[in-house]
Amino acid sequence: MILRYIPYIQTNFVLGLDGDNGTEPFELTRKFIDLAPGAFPAYSLLSAFGRAAPLNLEYQRAGRVLPFPFHFLNNNHAMNVRPKHYSWPEFYDGLIDVTRYSFSWRAIARRVPATATAIPKWMNVVRAMSSEGWGRIEYHTKIRRLLDTDRSVRDYLEGETNVLPAFYHDRIRRELGPLYEYLPDGAVYHDPNAYLESASQTPAAEPVSLRSRRAG
């Protein structure tokens, strides 16, 4: 009904929230895709961005925030909060499944007639076939494979080491190209618990008594 009045709709989902458990969140998302074929789904991975939300303090107290370089904190190339109710393989299996379902030829074909005007129709097709759709399926599938085959990636995601795996380091070097050499020392590392540490160092406010001024 909304598409009668608004030519293009994108629906945003955040995957990996603490309330998510089991297969149900992924199954319900697939159900949404079936019931609202005209809406373009955009999936984001749970991320803690510094002081962006007080909830980040809880993640840091629990030791769940990972030191991913800022280069990857774009909501889809890395999830810097360890999921509460999933192992990493379980989470990526669900993520890949729902992403494949959302950008399958069947879903793309149903999205076209559900959209009224020509430009939004083609935008849905192009976005699904680009890095936003098929590209992310390929990337997430690669991460899932590395979880089984590259111990450095698995240890990093489990929070057992803060040494950035070669896979991520090489990607930064490749994407920055000639600009990579200008990165300062330590640019790919940061303290993931800086917010918590700064909050614990903030001095407590002392009560101040206000005395009424005596009439002269």
Regions found by a protein language model. Give the residues of each.
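C-terminal non-catalytic accessory extensions
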Residues: 134-216
